[in-house]
């Protein structure tokens, strides 16, 4: 990792707003350098948020939300409240995104506010749990919706589900490695299937209501509990719902590429989050018009069961549409995770080979292969709902830490420019909700939450050995350099270059900056004084 930082800074002298080589455009500039361009306008920004939120969650999580909520009415309330809380969290991230205008999202914010260790733990848990788990769940959902029509009287075989999910991951990894343009076109095509599936579900729900089929939506029936209310289970219902809203913060990963981020970042949030909340709530209402709670809980593919009850001979449309949606979701997640891992490697927090791109295709092949391998390993986990709980708990943990960092930054640095400045009541509301989820989730599922925390804490020794400890044995450095060289030759990749950076004079200074928080105890202590204190 140390060498990765050295190679990175040889070619990349960062300005205060972040690196100019953090992404991988489809072609290099004439001088051999790679630079980010501000090409994401308002429409594209909304597409990033909506496209990343609407994945497999709305087709998988309705079962988990209803099961833990205990009644139809409370389940609908969970979907509405989760959407509102998501909007509050997105507003907090909007302020952070323009105050710390770096790509990398909450990883960059946590690193700059709390220091290198905290940022590394965020990246570490994303590498080990969040992205592999998310991609595994979406891939398993894809395979379930493809195979379910072939097994109308029983569940598809587990081995078949996992094999098809693995094939899906390998195929899309190849597409993303081959061309950024190909990956973008795949995303556009399969987003159409995603929107078609949800529009069809909502329209059929409206038709059902017009026909008087709304028994479970009547107040006396909607709040008829089929199990004893439990505050811990309600917290788990919110975690299941939060999985469906996952991806609302992905626009912050590409802040440096936004056209006029001070305007378009909050505008995209104001448009996208209410739109997704509307779609999610009415999709769940549509499910209830066609299925009883017992039927919904018994279904392993909610949207397929919905289509079978309402579409008759055209029921095949639903599994195909949902499969298209989840296939595109895997593609988008692979693309996003490669950007995050690339950014982490650029900061010296991941092996330097992950910061390399193909010499002609300009795709981050090592980062894509790494995330594909980690997702394939995650497929051995037997219960996808346990995977969702892992993702939800750890995500809320770091969402809360990031929003807490917003309050810390207000206190420590009250005078720094803030083009967007929200009322402090918003982060406080979000933190209270976050605390409620974590406390009661830990109470209800101590083993699941404990495993998530244990995985996160494994990053502490890795950080001190891999990042903080700079004077490693020469034999270790030579071995890592050999592995990096072999990987370069196998993948035909190089470090991206930009004009204006040469030599190694900034290496120690920038590595020291990684380990220091933005909020220093002594305001006058800057990078120069830190560098002078080095032996």
UniProtKB/Swiss-Prot annotation:
Optimum pH is 6.5. NCBIfam families: 2A0308. Residues 1-10 have a biased composition (Basic residues). Associates with SLC3A2 to form a functional heterodimeric complex that translocates small and large neutral amino acids with broad specificity and a stoichiometry of 1:1. Functions as amino acid antiporter mediating the influx of extracellular essential amino acids mainly in exchange with the efflux of highly concentrated intracellular amino acids. Has relatively symmetrical selectivities but strongly asymmetrical substrate affinities at both the intracellular and extracellular sides of the transporter. Residues 66-73, 150-157, 211-230, 288-312, 383-386 are extracellular. The chain crosses the membrane at residues 45-65, 74-95, 117-149, 158-178, 182-210, 231-252, 266-287, 313-338, 365-382, 387-408, 424-446, 447-466. InterPro entries: AA/rel_permease1, AminoAcid_Transporter, L_AA_transporter. Residues 1-30, 500-535 are annotated as: Disordered. It is found in: Cell membrane; Basolateral cell membrane. The modification Phosphoserine is found at residues 19, 28-29, 529. It is a multi-pass membrane protein. GO terms for cellular component: apical plasma membrane; basolateral plasma membrane; membrane; microvillus membrane. The record marks 134, 246 as: Important for substrate specificity. Mainly expressed in kidney and small intestine. It catalyses: L-histidine(in) + L-phenylalanine(out) = L-histidine(out) + L-phenylalanine(in); L-tryptophan(in) + L-phenylalanine(out) = L-tryptophan(out) + L-phenylalanine(in); L-isoleucine(in) + L-phenylalanine(out) = L-isoleucine(out) + L-phenylalanine(in); L-valine(in) + L-phenylalanine(out) = L-valine(out) + L-phenylalanine(in). Belongs to the amino acid-polyamine-organocation (APC) superfamily. L-type amino acid transporter (LAT) (TC 2.A.3.8) family. This is Large neutral amino acids transporter small subunit 2. Residues 524-535 have a biased composition (Basic and acidic residues). L-leucine binds at residues 53, 246. L-tryptophan binds at residues 134, 395. One of its GO terms (molecular function) is protein heterodimerization activity.
């Amino acid at each position: 990792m140390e060498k990765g930082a050295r190679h990175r800074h040889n070619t990349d002298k960062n300005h205060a707003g972040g690196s100019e080589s953090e992404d991988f455009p489809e072609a290099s500039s004439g001088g051999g350098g790679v630079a980010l361009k501000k090409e994401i306008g308002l429409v594209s920004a909304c597409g990033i948020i909506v496209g990343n939120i609407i994945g497999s969650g709305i087709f998988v999580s309705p079962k988990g939300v209803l099961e833990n909520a205990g009644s139809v009415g409370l389940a609908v309330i969970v979907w509405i409240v989760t959407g509102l809380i998501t909007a509050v969290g997105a507003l907090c991230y909007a302020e952070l995104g323009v105050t710390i205008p770096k790509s990398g999202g909450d990883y960059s914010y946590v690193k700059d506010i709390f220091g290198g260790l905290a940022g590394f733990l965020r990246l570490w848990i994303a590498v080990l749990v969040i992205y592999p788990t998310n991609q595994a769940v979406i891939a398993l959902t894809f395979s379930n919706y493809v195979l379910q029509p072939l097994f109308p009287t029983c569940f598809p075989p587990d081995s078949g589900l996992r094999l098809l999910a693995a094939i899906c991951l390998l195929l899309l990894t190849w597409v993303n490695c081959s061309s950024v343009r190909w990956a973008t076109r795949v995303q556009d095509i399969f987003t159409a299937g995603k929107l078609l599936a949800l529009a069809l579900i909502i329209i059929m729900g409206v038709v059902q209501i017009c026909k008087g089929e709304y028994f479970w939506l009547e107040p006396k029936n909607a709040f008829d509990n089929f199990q004893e209310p439990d505050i811990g289970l309600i917290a788990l219902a919110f975690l299941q719902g939060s999985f469906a809203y996952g991806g609302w913060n992905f626009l912050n990963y590409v802040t440096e590429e936004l056209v006029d981020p001070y305007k378009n970042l909050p505008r995209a949030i104001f448009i996208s989050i209410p739109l997704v909340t509307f779609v999610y709530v009415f999709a769940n209402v549509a499910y209830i018009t066609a299925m009883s709670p017992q039927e919904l809980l018994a279904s392993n593919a909610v949207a397929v069961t919905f289509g079978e009850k309402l579409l008759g001979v055209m029921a095949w449309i639903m599994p195909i549409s949902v499969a298209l949606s989840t296939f595109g979701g895997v593609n988008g997640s692979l693309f996003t995770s490669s950007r995050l891992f690339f950014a982490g490697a650029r900061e010296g927090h991941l092996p330097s080979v992950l910061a390399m791109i193909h010499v002609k295709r300009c795709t981050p092949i090592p980062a894509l292969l790494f995330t594909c391998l980690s997702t394939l390993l995650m497929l051995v986990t037997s219960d996808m709902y346990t995977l969702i709980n892992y993702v939800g708990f750890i995500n809320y943990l770091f969402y809360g830490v990031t929003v807490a960092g917003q309050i810390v930054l207000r206190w420590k640095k009250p005078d720094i420019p803030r083009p967007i400045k929200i009322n402090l009541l918003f982060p406080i509301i979000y933190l209270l909700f976050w605390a409620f989820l974590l406390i009661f989730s830990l109470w209800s599922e101590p083993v699941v939450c404990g495993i998530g925390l244990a995985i996160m804490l494994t990053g502490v020794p890795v950080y001190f050995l891999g990042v903080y400890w700079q004077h490693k044995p020469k034999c270790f450095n030579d071995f890592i350099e050999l592995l990096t060289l072999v990987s370069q030759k196998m993948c035909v990749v190089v470090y991206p270059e930009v004009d204006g950076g040469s030599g190694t004079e900034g290496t120690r200074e920038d590595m020291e900056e990684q380990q220091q928080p933005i909020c220093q105890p002594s305001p006058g202590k800057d990078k120069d004084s830190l560098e002078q204190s080095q032996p």
